[in-house]
Regions:
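Rossmann-fold NAD(P)-binding glycine/threonine-rich loop
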Residues: 1-41
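Generic recognition of flexible, low-complexity loop/linker segments
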Residues: 2-3, 87, 127-129
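Active-site proximal loops enriched in glycine and acidic residues that flank catalytic Cys/His/Asp
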Residues: 18-19, 48, 92, 144
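Glycine-rich beta-alpha junction loops
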Residues: 19-23, 51, 124-126
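Short, acidic Gly/Pro/Ser/Thr-rich loop/turn segments
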Residues: 22, 52-54, 148-150
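Adenosine-phosphate binding glycine-rich loop
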Residues: 26-118
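Phosphate-binding loop/pocket of nucleotide- and phosphate-handling active sites
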Residues: 105-162
Length: 162
C-alpha cells in the first residue's frame, strides 16, 4: 500500500518486484516472478490484485503491535501461510533483471514510445512470460483519485493513518 501511495503522491515511478511459489500438490510447485511499474496510467498493485488490503493490515499489525497480531492469529483471524517463500538465487536474480530492464526501458525509451510495461509475469515452471495490461479500476482509492496525483508532502504522510 505504501509504494502505491508514494508513487502517486510524489509522481515518482516505482518498480515493484515479487516472487511467489504456489503449491500445486504435495511434491510440486508453480513459481512466478512479477514486475509491476507504478506510473500514471498503469494499474496500481491494488487494482492488479497483487496486494491484499487485509494481509497488508495484518503485516502492519505484526510490526507495530505483535501482541494484538498474536491474539488475532490465535483467534484464526489471520490469513494462513500455506505457501513457501522462495529465495533461490537464480530466480530472484532473474526477477531483479526483469525490473532493471523495465527501468532501462523507462529512462532510454529503447522499447519504443509505449514505455515501461504495466506488469510482466514470468512463469518459471512453464518457461513463459505474460504481459498484463490491466487498466486502473475506476473506483480505486489510490490510482484513480485525482487529488493525490503529485500532491507531495502532506500530514499525515501520504494521507496514511495507522
Amino acid at each position: 500500500m505504501f509504494l502505491n501511495r508514494f508513487a502517486r503522491f510524489y509522481g515518482i515511478p516505482v518498480i515493484d518486484v515479487g516472487l511467489a511459489m504456489q503449491r500445486r500438490d504435495d511434491q510440486s510447485f508453480d513459481l512466478f516472478a512479477r514486475v509491476s511499474t507504478l506510473v500514471v496510467g498503469h494499474a496500481c498493485l491494488l487494482c492488479g490484485g497483487f496486494i491484499d488490503p487485509r494481509r497488508a493490515r495484518e503485516e502492519t499489525l505484526r510490526r507495530t503491535d505483535p501482541n494484538a497480531y498474536q491474539k488475532l492469529k490465535e483467534e484464526a483471524y489471520v490469513l494462513g501461510e500455506g505457501d513457501p517463500s522462495p529465495a533461490v538465487v537464480t530466480f530472484t536474480t532473474e526477477a531483479a533483471s526483469m525490473a532493471v530492464n523495465e527501468w532501462l526501458t523507462g529512462i532510454t525509451g529503447f522499447a519504443g514510445p509505449s514505455g515501461m510495461l504495466p506488469t510482466r509475469i514470468r512463469r518459471f515452471h512453464a518457461r513463459d512470460e505474460r504481459v498484463l495490461g490491466l487498466p486502473p479500476k475506476p473506483d480505486c482509492p489510490c490510482c484513480e483519485n485525482p487529488s493525490t496525483l503529485g500532491r507531495g508532502d502532506v500530514t499525515p504522510f501520504i494521507d496514511m493513518v495507522s
